A protein has these predicted regions:
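C-terminal catalytic/acceptor-binding lobe
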Residues: 2-20, 31-38, 45, 215-355
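Hydrophobic targeting segments
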Residues: 21-27, 49, 53-56
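A conserved acidic beta->alpha catalytic loop
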Residues: 29, 34, 48, 57-68, ...
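Active-site-proximal specificity loops/subdomain of glycosyltransferases
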Residues: 60-101
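Short beta-strand-to-loop acidic/aromatic patch adjacent to the donor-nucleotide binding site
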Residues: 101-114
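Conserved catalytic core of nucleotide-sugar-dependent glycosyltransferases
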Residues: 114-230
Length: 433
């Protein structure tokens, strides 16, 4: 680190994040639904990093209005397509960075670090690692919180135990990977650790292999972290990107060849600033639903952003639902995209959904699970799926067919109980990325 950096950190940045002249923070911001809490979160984030080297791009989608001022370090891009453009935007920023920056840190614009020295320590980590997360633990803050409402220290030890960890606290993927490769390879998200929020890498890694940019409804962080660890074809990814595995595996293999499993992290906590209900994000479901549509999106514009005329209704429904911050809005989850294989996929997804709901409530009786299902699914328009789920929940072909109206679905649902012990199973968190 240069002497000038040391002097700045001592005399100018006493209570701020410490700087490093060869490191740069990059980020992208888009808020097509005009969620006011997103802008509030951005302002808190930006106030914490504005004295550091940074480049931010705002993506203005459709006829929505820009929210950030254009400056030397904040630029603006327009696109008509409502997609998750995050990785495409980050890749564009990296391609235009001055060569003096050797270490690149891409952050979500809604995070705060408790470790004021995180940037300097992260650069130190990248002397021996190729990629890293600049935090050990992350916490989802509640609305209007500036600090967690619970004692973090009392939950650190149990953070890898799905049954004991605090529901708003995770250990980072990279911290778990450094402790044990078995932890990071686990199929349970809560065990392998959080994959999002903030990353850092040596510049040459991103120059050689740009971030995976085809996760156009999210999930690229999850793809990247398993790729960095050499988990090619990991079930976390295959169960989500059901139609794009070949392309993802090809990218992941090349990325791992560069990173070679050299993954680091630094001590400290990251706070995720509230800007909406986490339960509305539906990380896994949204990717599964959108997976087949990704094959139809291949064209890019002059800025390197994907453009499309398909999937727009689903994306708009999803973002409207996700970004609605009113507690009494009564909004519904987004529509499901239809395709040739939707019948089979819907059966698989719905069964998985019920299994996950049940595994979260491990002490729930079969009768309670049935009542739970009826409450959350009061009406259905597909008797086969209804009967399959009810046959599975009631463990009865007769009850499943009488209640759902399709004997074949009930038979299959009942039969699935032979291979799935209802009272067991592990907790599966839908927090995909």
């Amino acid at each position: 680190m240069k002497i000038s950096d040391t002097l700045k950190n001592i005399f100018l940045y006493g209570n701020k994040y410490k700087t490093h002249s060869e490191a740069v923070i990059i980020a992208c911001y888009f808020n097509p639904q005009g969620n006011p809490y997103r802008l509030i979160a951005f302002n808190k984030f930006y106030d914490s990093i504005k004295h550091l080297n940074h480049r931010i791009v705002e993506c203005v989608i459709g006829d929505t209005q820009a929210e950030l001022p254009e400056t030397e370090f904040i630029t603006r891009i327009h696109t008509p397509s409502l997609l998750w453009h995050k990785e495409s935007l980050l890749n564009k920023i990296v391609s235009e960075l001055p060569k003096k920056f050797k270490y690149v840190f891409w952050l979500d614009t809604d995070v705060i670090f408790t470790n004021k020295n995180w940037l300097v320590e992260s650069v130190e980590s990248l002397q021996t690692n190729n990629i890293m997360q600049p935090f050990e633990y992350c916490v989802h803050l509640d609305q209007d919180e500036t600090d967690p409402s619970f004692n973090l220290d009392s939950y650190r030890i149990s953070s890898r135990d799905p049954k004991l960890r605090h529901p708003k606290m995770w250990r980072s993927f990279c911290a778990n990977h450094n402790e044990s490769a078995d932890l990071s390879c686990d199929v349970n998200y809560d065990k392998h650790g959080h994959v999002g929020f903030a990353w850092g890498a040596r510049r040459e890694i991103l120059d050689t292999m740009p971030l995976y940019d085809k996760a156009l409804i999210g999930g690229a962080d999850h793809v990247m972290c398993h790729a960095a660890a050499g988990h090619i074809g990991h079930s976390c990814i295959t169960k989500a990107f059901t139609e794009n595995i070949k392309e993802i595996n090809e990218w992941s293999t090349k990325f791992y060849a560069l990173v070679q499993g050299k993954i680091g992290y630094v001590k400290g906590d990251l706070y995720h600033i509230w800007h909406g209900d986490l339960g509305k994000r539906q990380y896994l479901k949204r990717i599964q639903d959108f997976s087949s549509t990704l094959n139809e999106i291949n064209e890019k514009d002059e800025n390197g952003l994907y453009k499309t005329s398909v999937g727009g209704e689903y994306m708009e429904e999803y973002f409207n639902y996700r970004e609605n911050t009113k507690t009494d809005a009564g909004s519904e989850p987004p529509l499901k995209i239809t395709s040739k294989t939707d019948k089979r996929k819907d059966v698989i997804h719905k069964l998985g959904e019920i299994r996950e709901q049940k595994s979260i409530k491990q002490n729930m009786s079969r009768e309670e699970a049935y009542e739970h299902y009826k409450y959350y699914h009061p009406t259905r328009d597909d008797s086969f799926i209804e009967s399959l789920v009810l046959g599975y929940l009631t463990n009865s072909t007769v009850e499943g067919s009488l209640l759902g109206g399709d004997i074949l679905g009930a038979v299959i649902g009942d039969a699935l109980n032979d291979t799935d012990d209802f009272s067991g199973g592990e907790y599966i968190n839908d927090n995909f990325s």
